[in-house]
């Protein structure tokens, strides 16, 4: 174990998360059809400020992320500041780390607080899979640029005459990795085969996720952290996540065909997280600032770590690389954790990471450690369900997990929690949270 790395300011203040909030998450082209991510971000930040009871003038900075970016609003963070009545002097910038984007936003805010450059800030993310940047072909794009420089109508017509019919077709956003051409689901399939993750085990984890998420909603455990959303034309309220299958069965899951490897695969729509719309944010500040404002902490950020690995194989093992670092920096072990929350991009990816957590061979050969961090106690794992059930608005998932874990730790009387996620590009994130 390496030496602990305390997350404190020069005055010894810890990093406080005062509050966290998210919109209900909705499957693509359902409740938020036509609502761009920037509007979802404005909705959640406005409500977070209202619930926190502090003046927006006190917010020094807003760090926000969006993975599927819209060309007309490339800096979503600044647009949220300008669209929510916050001070125009509030600093704002956007970040992107694929599925770990709001983890990055939280880390950036923490570093700014530690450096003393800000006292109070908001971190979060929003994504819409329903409002997408539909592009044009490279041939048409080049022609449009050239036509803009053409001096006469005849020159423009000559340029356009070279185009073929297929060049005029719209181009949807890529779903594959830019560097490899592999889809995330392809990597999930590879990991399932490499690590012997059966279809039955994947379906069982997916069912567990939906059952626990349904129970969390039924018991009212999520009501304080999920706002009611109203969107144009304001005819009805959006109250709950709409992806959770409250009465599904393994028999139903077993009927689905593989989604990626049609002949020999095991990854299906049921044991994968769906395309989702939503937003989430957290309010952060130094411990002394929270005390001065009379704001009780929801919890503390104890440590964080990011990792980067190969993209050709095992690209979704980021949690297995980032988690040991976060544990070391917090000065704790896996056994010290009260809760463990791992992003469920795919059941196969989740189960593969759990295997690597417990693998001494992986620890020695990949991490250079003498032994594994340990086997996960499933009674601590994703106790309210995970992304397979809730959905995955890419940039919002980290903030959802952080808020959900802190609230559940508080409900249980305190303790330490791990939140961790894989991300496209072979990236990983892990954070240790504490509730007293």
UniProtKB/Swiss-Prot annotation:
It is an enzyme of class 2 (transferase). Gene3D superfamilies: 3.40.47.10. The active site is at residues 99, 392, 422. GO terms for molecular function: acetyl-CoA C-acetyltransferase activity. It catalyses: an acyl-CoA + acetyl-CoA = a 3-oxoacyl-CoA + CoA. Its main location: cytoplasm. Pathway: Lipid metabolism; fatty acid beta-oxidation. One of its GO terms (biological process) is fatty acid beta-oxidation. It comes from the Bacteria. InterPro entries: Ac-CoA_C-AcTrfase_FadI, Thiolase, Thiolase-like, Thiolase_acyl_enz_int_AS, Thiolase_AS, Thiolase_C, Thiolase_CS, Thiolase_N. Keywords: Acyltransferase, Cytoplasm, Fatty acid metabolism, Lipid degradation, Lipid metabolism, Transferase. It is found in: Cytoplasm. Its EC number is 2.3.1.16. GO terms for cellular component: cytosol. HAMAP family: FadI. Catalyzes the final step of fatty acid oxidation in which acetyl-CoA is released and the CoA ester of a fatty acid two carbons shorter is formed. Heterotetramer of two alpha chains (FadJ) and two beta chains (FadI). Belongs to the thiolase-like superfamily. Thiolase family. This is 3-ketoacyl-CoA thiolase. It comes from Yersinia pestis.
């Amino acid at each position: 174990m390496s030496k602990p790395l305390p997350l404190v300011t020069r005055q010894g203040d810890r990093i406080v998360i005062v509050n966290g909030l998210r919109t209900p998450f909705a499957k693509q082209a359902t409740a938020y059809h036509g609502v761009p991510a920037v509007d979802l971000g404005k909705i959640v930040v406005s409500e977070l400020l209202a619930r926190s009871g502090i003046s927006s003038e006190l917010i020094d900075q807003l760090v926000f992320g969006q993975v599927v970016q819209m060309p007309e609003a490339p800096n979503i963070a600044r647009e949220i500041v300008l669209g929510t009545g916050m001070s125009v002097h509030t600093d704002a910038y956007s970040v992107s780390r694929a599925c770990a984007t709001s983890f990055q936003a939280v880390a950036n805010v923490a570093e700014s607080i530690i450096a003393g450059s800000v006292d109070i800030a908001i971190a979060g993310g929003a994504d819409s899979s329903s409002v997408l940047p539909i592009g044009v072909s490279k041939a048409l794009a080049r022609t449009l640029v050239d036509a803009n420089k053409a001096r006469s109508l005849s020159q423009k017509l000559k340029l356009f005459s070279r185009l073929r019919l297929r060049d005029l077709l719209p181009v949807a956003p890529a779903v594959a990795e830019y560097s490899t051409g592999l889809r995330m689901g392809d990597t999930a399939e590879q990991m399932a085969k490499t690590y012997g993750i059966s279809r039955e085990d994947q379906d069982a984890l997916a069912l567990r996720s939906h059952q626990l998420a349904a129970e969390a909603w039924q018991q009212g455990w999520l009501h304080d952290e999920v706002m009611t959303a109203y969107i144009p034309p304001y005819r009805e309220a959006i109250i709950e996540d709409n992806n959770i299958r409250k009465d599904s069965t393994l028999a139903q899951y077993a009927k689905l065909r593989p989604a990626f490897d049609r002949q020999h695969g095991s990854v299906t729509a049921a044991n994968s997280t769906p395309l989702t719309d939503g937003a989430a944010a957290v309010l952060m500040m130094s411990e002394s600032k929270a005390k001065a404002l009379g704001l009780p902490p929801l919890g503390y950020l104890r440590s964080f770590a990011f990792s980067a690995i190969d993209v050709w194989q095992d690209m979704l093992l980021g949690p297995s690389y980032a988690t040991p670092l976060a544990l070391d920096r917090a000065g704790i072990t896996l056994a010290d954790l009260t809760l463990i929350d791992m992003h469920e991009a795919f059941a196969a990816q989740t189960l593969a990471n759990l295997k690597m957590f417990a693998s001494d061979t992986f620890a020695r050969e990949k991490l250079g450690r003498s032994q594994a961090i340990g086997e996960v106690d499933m009674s601590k794992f994703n106790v309210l369900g995970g992304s397979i059930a809730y959905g995955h608005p890419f940039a919002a998932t980290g903030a959802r997990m952080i808020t959900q874990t802190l609230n559940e730790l508080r409900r249980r009387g305190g303790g330490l929690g791990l939140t961790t996620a894989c991300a496209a590009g072979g990236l990983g994130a892990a954070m240790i949270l504490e509730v007293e």
